[in-house]
Curated annotation (Swiss-Prot):
Organism name: Rattus norvegicus (Rat)
Post-translational modification: Monoubiquitinated. Ubiquitination activates deubiquitination activity in vitro.
Protein name as annotated: Josephin-1
InterPro entries assigned to the protein according to its UniProt record, in alphabetical order: JOSD1/2, Josephin
UniProt KW keywords: Cell membrane, Cytoplasm, Hydrolase, Membrane, Phosphoprotein, Protease, Ubl conjugation, Ubl conjugation pathway
Modified residue annotations for Phosphoserine: S15
Biological process terms in GO annotation: cell motility; endocytosis; membrane biogenesis; membrane organization; protein deubiquitination; proteolysis
Gene (UniProt): Josd1
EC code(s) of this entry: 3.4.19.12
CC terms in the record's Gene Ontology section: cytoplasm; plasma membrane
Subunit structure: Interacts with beta-actin/ACTB.
GO molecular function: cysteine-type deubiquitinase activity
The keyword Cell membrane is annotated on this UniProt entry: yes
Length: 202
């Protein structure tokens, strides 16, 4: 099964639909170039200054000290399409950890109150200007709670996508995790990771 756009419960979403304008209190960093990892991180922290392209590039270089970077390769490597190791190291600089979620587990055991947000890696359509190409590429997105509701803060969206409460969030996560090549990271404070208190079954 491929990762298709989240539709949710149509009847429920129509009855609880929010105004079209994005709530002003939500920070939603939009896609530019291929900086989806940067956008996902800043959207998780709800802070445009949490990380910069230069910060992530420095982390990449630290993790790969033997990489010979010519000006041409530096441009390629700095395109923002960073792997999970860069994201995990970036979170650690802020006192947070990324917990990889085993897709065989039930998302019902996630202690949502102890999770700041989620970063997902899933296939996304490639676009050339206004044209959507018949190709897929892995893409980082952020999902988190703001003002008592959960939102999909995918940087490719024009505005935050309202998911709903905890029950709707779990349905959203289950839906995507059933798909091929979809992975989930739980963003939690260091002490939560140390005590595994992101789990409701411990």
């Amino acid at each position: 099964m491929s990762c298709m756009p989240w539709k949710g419960d149509k009847a429920k979403s129509e009855s609880l639909e929010l105004p079209q304008a994005a709530p002003p209190q939500i920070y939603h960093e939009k896609q530019r170039r291929e900086l989806c990892a940067l956008h996902a991180l800043n959207n998780v922290f709800q802070d445009s200054n949490a990380f910069t392209r230069e910060t992530l590039q420095e982390i990449f270089q630290r993790l790969s000290p033997n990489t010979v970077v010519t000006p041409h390769k530096k441009s390629m490597l700095g395109n923002g399409n960073y792997d999970v190791n860069v994201i995990m190291a970036a979170l650690q600089t802020k006192g947070y950890e990324a917990v990889w979620w085993d897709k065989r587990r039930d998302v019902g055991v996630i202690a949502l109150a102890n999770v700041m947000g989620f970063i997902m890696n899933l296939p996304s359509s490639l676009c050339w200007g206004p044209l959507k190409l018949p190709l897929k590429r892995q893409h980082w997105i952020c999902v988190r709670e703001v003002g008592g509701a959960y939102y999909n803060l995918d940087s490719k969206l024009k505005m935050p996508e309202w998911i709903g409460g905890e029950s709707e969030l779990r349905k959203f996560l289950k839906y995507h995790l059933r798909g091929k090549n979809c992975e989930l990271l739980l963003v939690v404070p260091e002490e939560v990771e140390a005590h595994q208190s992101w789990r409701a079954d411990v």
